[in-house]
Amino acid sequence: MKRVVTLVSKEQAEVGHRFRVFSVPDECKSCRLFSVCLGRLTPGRSYKVVEVRPSMGQRCKITDSEMVPVVVEEAPIVGLLPLNKALEGVVVTYEDECAGCEGCPNDVVKKGEKVKVVKILGRKKCRNKEFAIVEFFVVSAPSHAVLDSSKTAQAPSRAPSSRRPLK
């Protein structure tokens, strides 16, 4: 799991604390601490504090609260993938097949991003299609190498062509 050092408020600086970054306020982008604070995190993703480091007295420009350095790891995303892509340990290209379904992770994963399935949690039917409810991590951004003026390159899915159905 990817770990990164960032800053959180003193109240959030507890091992095991989980939080989600929804967006980055404009005021943060001009702060001298941005590159070691929210600048290291991805909006839409969830994180878990795994280590608290000694405070160095930094203060938040917006809240004026004490900021504490912590080590966080990205928490897995829970969302829907087509059954043929849902196999633990497999890296697949997210194609947005579940758009419009409750539980579809469109707000945190972009079409074309590579995701690694870490756990299968169950099944769900939406729009007459079967999906697996899975935990996964984004492992790379979408590929944008131009093939010609109308197409972009996409790596083929490494999902197996056939597999046992989920129980």
From Swiss-Prot:
InterPro entries the UniProt entry points to: UPF0179 (IPR005369)
Domain of life of the native organism: Archaea
Signal peptide limits: none
UniProt-listed PANTHER family: UPF0179 PROTEIN MJ1627
Family designation: Belongs to the UPF0179 family.
Name of the molecule in the record: UPF0179 protein Pars_2336
Protein species of origin: Pyrobaculum arsenaticum (strain DSM 13514 / JCM 11321 / PZ6)
Upper lineage: Archaea, Thermoproteota, Thermoprotei, Thermoproteales, Thermoproteaceae
